[in-house]
């Protein structure tokens, strides 16, 4: 399991959104993908507002809502998958290589969206990435891992996460996080 020995209940699972590097979209309209995800997370209010806002964060036109995944470019698919994730307004996001395969403009849009989500909804992000430049402009705290071991811990203080890292470590029971009381 993604959570190790910790067994989160359904409410706790809905507080986390995991976004993979390859977009995962159902073979239905973009709007239907949004609606399916929001329903899965138990979200029943402000649906249209959430969809419009997440599209706006990534400079996506609402005309894409009627398209199917096979009608989208790979870049559009990646943006749509991220927009769907943002529409959930999860408490925590696990982003696996979010800048992989992105051009510079889209990478900048993703950075701005992450910062906006944190600013507007106090959302925490745990980002796994080999893209140091992407992380340098976003991360308050960085852990460098090799073969599952923490090699280095760095506090960059780009923006204040109000101890979201500590809450997240406790939430998923990372035993290594205990080494870093200030994380």
Tell me the role of every PLM-derived stretch:
Residues 68, 97-98:
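Walker B catalytic motif
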Residues 128-130:
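H-loop/switch region of ABC-family ATPase nucleotide-binding domains
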């Amino acid at each position: 399991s993604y959570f190790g020995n910790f067994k989160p209940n359904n409410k706790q699972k809905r507080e986390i959104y995991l976004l993979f590097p390859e977009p995962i979209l159902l073979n239905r309209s973009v709007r239907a993908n949004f609606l399916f995800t929001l329903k899965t997370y138990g979200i029943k209010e402000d649906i249209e507002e959430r969809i419009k806002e997440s599209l706006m964060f990534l400079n996506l036109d609402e005309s894409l809502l009627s398209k199917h995944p096979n009608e989208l470019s790979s870049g559009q698919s990646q943006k749509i998958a991220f927009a769907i994730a943002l529409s959930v307004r999860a408490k925590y996001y696990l982003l696996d290589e979010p800048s992989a395969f992105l051009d510079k403009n889209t990478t900048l849009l993703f950075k701005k969206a992450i910062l906006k989500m944190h600013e507007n909804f106090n959302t925490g992000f745990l980002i796994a990435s080999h893209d140091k430049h992407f992380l340098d402009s976003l991360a308050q705290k960085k852990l460098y891992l090799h073969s599952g071991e923490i090699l280095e811990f760095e506090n960059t203080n780009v923006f204040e996460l109000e101890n979201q890292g500590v809450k997240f470590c406790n939430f998923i029971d990372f035993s290594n996080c205990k080494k870093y009381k200030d994380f």
